[in-house]
Regions:
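Conserved beta-hairpin
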Residues: 52-70
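A short beta-loop-alpha structural element at the N-terminal edge
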Residues: 1-16
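Active-site rim helix/loop that mediates acceptor-substrate recognition in acyltransferases
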Residues: 33-56
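Conserved beta-strand-loop-alpha-helix junction that forms the acyl-donor binding cleft
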Residues: 126-135, 159-169, 185-186, 196
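Conserved GNAT acetyl-CoA-binding A-motif
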Residues: 122-123, 150-163
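Conserved acyl-donor/pantetheine-binding loop and adjacent beta-alpha core of acyl/acetyltransferases
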Residues: 66-129
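Conserved acetyl-CoA-binding loop-helix of GNAT-fold acetyltransferases
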Residues: 130, 136-149
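Conserved active-site alpha-helix within GNAT-family acetyltransferase domains
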Residues: 141, 153-154, 164-181, 185
Length: 212
């Protein structure tokens, strides 16, 4: 279901789930931020942007899990982008911001940029979050299905990027394919993932005709 309004406490829950994700021995691009709180504040800004842009969806009214995705051709208005800029600028000093920019500049263009260059349509997933109290209960599969079903309806692939091998493995388990990796020096790796649209389900009458 599409999310039109969201309490600040729920936005904070999402930010905390991202900012305090357990990377284990991995670095993750969380290292590009000056602190875990700064990463959480940036994600909160992203959630507000997705909310204003009409990109945010959830599994149910309980809000167990959230996903933000952009369909082919959808554009964000400046008003929607401002919360993301505020979240980024408000969470870092000028020096931290310059360091963040230098780290992000080390990576190659992502799969979405390659699709843009080739003028290929796709559905881009910018955020997937299962709130911490609902993790380990199958909600990641349920929330991803929202994007998968919409992409199948449109006949386009789903594209997503993540910054940890542990996350990448979960997405592959849930139907995505690893399309490539991008290294950001010693600060981590981004994994580009894709799920191609499922073949349309054939009707029983069509199957019977094929057998005649």
């Amino acid at each position: 279901m599409k999310v039109d309004t969201l309490e600040e406490s729920r936005i904070s829950d999402i930010g905390h789930a991202f900012g305090y994700y357990d990377y284990g021995s991995e670095h993750g691009l969380i290292d590009a931020f000056p602190s875990r709180d700064a990463a959480a504040a940036f994600i909160c800004g992203y959630v507000r942007m997705a909310l204003l842009g009409g990109l945010l969806h959830t599994t149910s009214e309980k809000g167990e899990a959230y996903i933000a995705y952009k369909r082919p051709g959808e554009k964000l208005r400046l008003k929607a982008v401002l919360p993301l800029a505020k979240g980024l600028l408000g969470s870092m000093s000028f020096g931290d911001l310059m360091r963040f920019a230098r780290i992000m500049a080390k990576g190659e263009p992502g799969l979405d940029k390659r699709f843009d260059k080739e003028k290929k349509p796709y559905l881009f997933v910018g955020m997937v979050c299962v709130r911490e109290s609902y993790q380990g209960q199958g909600y990641m599969r349920k929330v991803l299905k929202l994007a998968y079903d919409e992409a199948d309806r449109l006949g386009v692939p789903v594209i997503l990027e993540t910054d940890a091998q542990s996350k990448c493995d979960k997405y592959i388990h849930l139907g995505m394919e690893l399309a490539g990796t991008r290294r950001f020096g010693e600060h981590g790796v981004l994994y580009d993932l894709i799920k191609y649209p499922s073949a349309p389900r054939r009707s029983e009458s069509s199957s019977r005709r094929d057998q005649e």
